[in-house]
C-alpha cells in the first residue's frame, strides 16, 4: 500500500529563494472529503493527477495518486471543486540531500508560504534549513479546508500571524 510520509512547516524568511532549482504553477482542487480522508485533483504543467489520501496518523498517511487526462482535471476543477480550488507555485529547493517543496500560494491564500519534505521513514533524520519556521504537520489551522474557511470568514487573505492566532 503506498504511504506518504510528509512534514510541513511555515517558511520564516526568503533564504530559500536563491537555491530554487525548479518551479511549477499548480492548481489543486478538493473533490471530496470524508472521515479525515480526501480526494484531490491537481493540474500543473503538462500533467494532471487525482489523489486519494487516507486519514493522517502523525506525518504518515496512505496516498493513491494516478495520472488523468488534463481535460478531465480541468473539468473537475471547474465543475466539481468550485471554490475549493487553490493556486500556488511550487518551488523545488535542495538542502542537505533532500528536495524541499516550497509552496507560495496565490489568490484567496496569498501570503501563505509553506515548505514540505517527504521522508521514507517517520524517524528519518533531516537537517532543517535556516529559512524554516514552525512545524505545522499536525496543526489543523493549516489544513486547506481551515485556511479557506478562515479567509472566507474574514473576507480577505489572512497573514500567517492571524492564522496562528486563530482558534481551530
Tell me the role of every PLM-derived stretch.
Residues 1-168:
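Phosphate-end processing signature that detects enzymes handling 5′-triphosphorylated RNA
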